Structures are given as structure tokens and as C-alpha cells.
Amino acid sequence: MQTDKKKNYEQQPVILFADDDAICLEVGLKILQKLGYKALGARDGKEAIEVFLNNQREVKLVILDMKMPYNGCTAFFQLKKINASVKVLIASGYAKDQQIRELMKQGCNGFILKPFSINELSRKVSGILNE
């Protein structure tokens, strides 16, 4: 039975969640875990790049906060240089941001307005993972 649990855990999609706000990061990781995903965290865009480099075979989606040190925009383009097919969801408290519109044109997979509900995050993540 333990093997089945381990196997199921290994089959969980891995999501990298990056946010410089410690509370947002902690809550985001807990929500993703509650939704059945294996979640990795990063405190800024630079750390997100490092975590992705170390786990790029496993990471199925990266969620980037737009406004953080080494911001989401910069991290997005670095991630795309590393792996052009990486799926990225941008999270921001600013809905009308020109940078977000530009990222969507450049291949970003989605946008979610902060604060978001568990249901909103679940819909966005599952939609992107099933593309």
C-alpha cells in the first residue's frame, strides 16, 4: 500500500509558485498542495529561475507574481530561454498592466488576479495543465 501512495505522489504535477510576499507564498503553496499538486516555492524571480533549473523535468507549470524583486516579466523571459515550452501563469493585483498584456502576446499561458480564490486558482491551473 505504501508503494501506491508513493506512486501517486510521484504522479502529482509539480508546480513552482513564486511570490516575494511570505504570506502569499505560504498560502499559495498550501492551496496547491490541497488541490493535489506537488508545490515548490521561490521568494523572487531569480530564485524561481534557480528552482526551475534544478527541477525543470518535473515542473509542469510556473506561477509568477508580477511585482517582486527580479519581477515576473524578467523571470518569464528567462524561463522561456531555458525551456520555450514551459507553461507560465502570471499572478498580479493589477489587472490593467501593459506588461501583462505583452506577456500574453509573448506566450504566457494565463493571468490570475490577486487575491484569488481556491476555485479560481484550481480552474486556471487545471486549464493550463490540460492545454
Please tell me what each predicted stretch does.
Residues 1-14:
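Disordered, acidic interdomain junction associated with two-component signaling
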Residues 74, 78-81, 89, 94-113, ...:
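Alpha4 helix (beta4-alpha4-beta5 surface) of REC/receiver domains from two-component response regulators
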